[in-house]
């Protein structure tokens, strides 16, 4: 039996999230397992690094599965992609040791939230970005973001339906990058709570719109009451772009994406 890790990219627009649900509900996991099972000629179950909600995209999702099928890595990629719908792609495949676990071996995660800040809505990328039609004060948003970096209780920034045992997370960095009319919020943490990035984005956008001062982000954090924060930002602009693992697993290093952004962003 061989354990295999895959890098997965998907457009979450037409999915009800990552996780397998009842029959007839379209999820990324369901599509991926069906495709891999055809290649393996046996039933395949995948374990992902992090589940994403309906409408959320992934460029750096990582999964693992076990198989005794005698397939080369390129066969998993080519065969899998042949059997996958057009909105899911296998980016890479590598054999890993039995102690590798897509979720529990991860040391950090990185998300990007992409905002199109323009008076007119986009026609081509309407499901890949969040449109904000009024100017945003990026300097104020950066100041607000600075209050959230570090080890904190993020109760006020998680969904009321979040089932995580602890609201304590370490936000390593929270950066804002301007690419013309596109604003990219990049969050890097040991792990994230349900809706955490989207709730952070909602607060920062409210600050950027001048409706709240930057220190309000800190006030929301310290109140530990979700009801006192901003509305949860839409899922369309959110991307899971990277899962970081110890170097000993030697997983491929790919551009974070989405692919229409430069490989390297500068503040």
Swiss-Prot record:
GO terms for biological process: tRNA pseudouridine synthesis. Its EC number is 5.4.99.12. The active site is at residue 53. The keyword Isomerase applies. Pfam families: PseudoU_synth_1. Homodimer. This is tRNA pseudouridine synthase A.
């Amino acid at each position: 039996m061989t354990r295999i890790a895959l890098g997965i990219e998907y457009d979450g627009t037409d999915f009800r999230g990552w996780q397998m649900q009842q029959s007839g509900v379209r999820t990324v996991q369901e599509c991926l397992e069906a495709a891999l099972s055809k290649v393996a000629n046996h039933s395949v179950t995948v374990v992902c690094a992090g589940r994403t909600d309906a409408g959320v995209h992934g460029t750096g999702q990582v999964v693992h599965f076990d198989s005794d099928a005698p397939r080369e890595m390129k066969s998993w990629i080519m065969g899998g992609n042949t059997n996958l719908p057009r909105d899911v792609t296998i980016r890479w495949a590598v054999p890993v040791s039995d102690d590798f676990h897509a979720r529990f071996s991860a040391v950090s995660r990185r998300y990007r939230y992409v905002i199109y800040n323009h008076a007119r809505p986009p026609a081509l990328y309407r499901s890949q970005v969040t449109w904000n039609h009024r100017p945003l004060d990026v300097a104020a948003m950066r100041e607000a973001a600075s209050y959230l970096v570090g080890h904190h209780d993020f109760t006020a920034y998680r969904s009321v339906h979040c089932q995580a045992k602890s609201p304590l997370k370490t936000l390593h960095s929270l950066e804002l990058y301007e690419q013309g009319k596109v604003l990219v919020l990049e969050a890097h943490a040991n792990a994230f709570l349900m809706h955490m990035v989207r709730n952070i984005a909602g607060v920062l956008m409210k600050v950027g719109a001048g409706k709240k001062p930057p220190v309000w982000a800190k006030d929301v954090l310290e109140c530990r009451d979700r009801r006192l924060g901003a509305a949860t930002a839409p899922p369309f602009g959110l991307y899971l772009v990277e899962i970081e693992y110890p170097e000993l697993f030697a997983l491929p290093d790919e551009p974070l994406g989405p692919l229409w952004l430069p490989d390297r962003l500068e503040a």
